[in-house]
C-alpha cells in the first residue's frame, strides 16, 4: 500500500459539487493498493500515518503526531494512480494497482485502522471522480510505502 501524506491547515473533497468529506487542521492521505497488498499492509500504513510526527511543538520542531493536535483529522482519499508506472513510454500503466473490488475492501480496512487508533477520519468516495482541495501547511509531504523505502 502506498500513501502520499500532506500536512494541511484544512481540506475537503467534493463529488458532483457536494462536499463528501472535510477536515480542519490535519493530514490528507492519498492512498492506493498494490495487487499483492493485504490487511497487514493497510495496518502498517495506518500505523505510520497515526504516529507520523510532522506537527510542530512549542519550540518549532516537528515532534507531534496527529493525536497531539487539537481538532486534527485525516482526510483519506483513494487513489489507484499512485501505482502509475511510466518507466516505459509516457502513458501510465496501472497494472500494479489492485483490482477495484478488492482495493475498496482494503481501503475500508485502512480507514478502520486509522479510526481504531483514535483518529477522526473523513473520506472521499471510492471510484468517484473527486475534486480535492488542500490548504497545504509547510508544505510537508511524506511518502509511505508498505513494501519499499523511498
Swiss-Prot record:
Which keywords belong to this entry?
Answer: Cytoplasm, Hydrolase, RNA-binding, tRNA-binding
What GO terms are given for molecular function?
A: D-tyrosyl-tRNA(Tyr) deacylase activity; Gly-tRNA(Ala) deacylase activity; Ser(Gly)-tRNA(Ala) hydrolase activity; tRNA binding
Is Transmembrane there in the keyword field? Answer: no
The short motif Gly-cisPro motif, important for rejection of L-amino acids is annotated over 138-139
Q: Which SUPFAM superfamilies match?
A: DTD-like (SSF69500)
* Enzyme Commission code: 3.1.1.96
Per its record, the protein catalyses: glycyl-tRNA(Ala) + H2O = tRNA(Ala) + glycine + H(+); a D-aminoacyl-tRNA + H2O = a tRNA + a D-alpha-amino acid + H(+)
Compartment list? Cytoplasm
Q: Which GO terms describe its biological process?
A: D-amino acid catabolic process
Which residue pairs form cystines in this protein? none
- Report whether Protein biosynthesis shows up as a keyword of the record: no
Q: According to the UniProt record, what class of enzyme is this?
A: hydrolase
**Quick one: signal sequence residues?**
none
Q: What cellular-component terms does GO give this entry?
A: cytoplasm
Its subunit composition reads: Homodimer.
Instruction: Give the protein's biological function.
Output: An aminoacyl-tRNA editing enzyme that deacylates mischarged D-aminoacyl-tRNAs. Also deacylates mischarged glycyl-tRNA(Ala), protecting cells against glycine mischarging by AlaRS. Acts via tRNA-based rather than protein-based catalysis; rejects L-amino acids rather than detecting D-amino acids in the active site. By recycling D-aminoacyl-tRNA to D-amino acids and free tRNA molecules, this enzyme counteracts the toxicity associated with the formation of D-aminoacyl-tRNA entities in vivo and helps enforce protein L-homochirality.
* Family as reported in the entry's similarity comment: Belongs to the DTD family.
Q: Which HAMAP family match?
A: Deacylase_Dtd
Domain remarks in the Swiss-Prot or TrEMBL record:
A Gly-cisPro motif from one monomer fits into the active site of the other monomer to allow specific chiral rejection of L-amino acids.
For this entry, the protein name equals D-aminoacyl-tRNA deacylase
Amino acid at each position: 500500500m502506498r500513501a502520499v501524506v500532506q500536512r494541511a491547515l484544512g481540506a475537503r473533497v467534493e463529488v458532483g459539487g457536494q462536499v463528501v468529506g472535510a477536515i480542519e487542521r490535519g493530514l490528507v492521505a492519498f492512498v492506493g493498493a498494490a495487487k499483492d497488498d493485504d490487511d497487514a499492509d493497510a495496518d502498517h500504513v495506518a500505523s505510520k500515518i497515526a504516529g507520523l510526527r510532522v506537527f510542530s511543538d512549542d519550540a518549532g520542531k516537528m515532534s507531534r503526531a496527529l493525536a497531539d493536535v487539537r481538532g486534527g483529522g485525516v482526510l483519506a482519499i483513494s487513489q489507484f494512480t499512485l501505482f502509475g508506472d511510466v518507466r516505459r513510454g509516457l502513458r501510465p500503466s496501472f497494472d500494479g494497482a489492485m483490482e477495484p473490488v478488492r482495493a475498496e475492501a482494503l481501503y475500508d480496512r485502512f480507514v478502520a485502522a486509522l479510526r481504531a487508533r483514535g483518529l477522526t477520519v473523513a473520506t472521499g468516495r471510492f471510484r468517484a471522480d473527486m475534486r480535492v482541495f488542500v490548504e497545504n501547511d509547510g508544505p510537508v509531504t511524506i511518502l509511505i510505502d508498505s513494501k519499499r523505502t523511498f
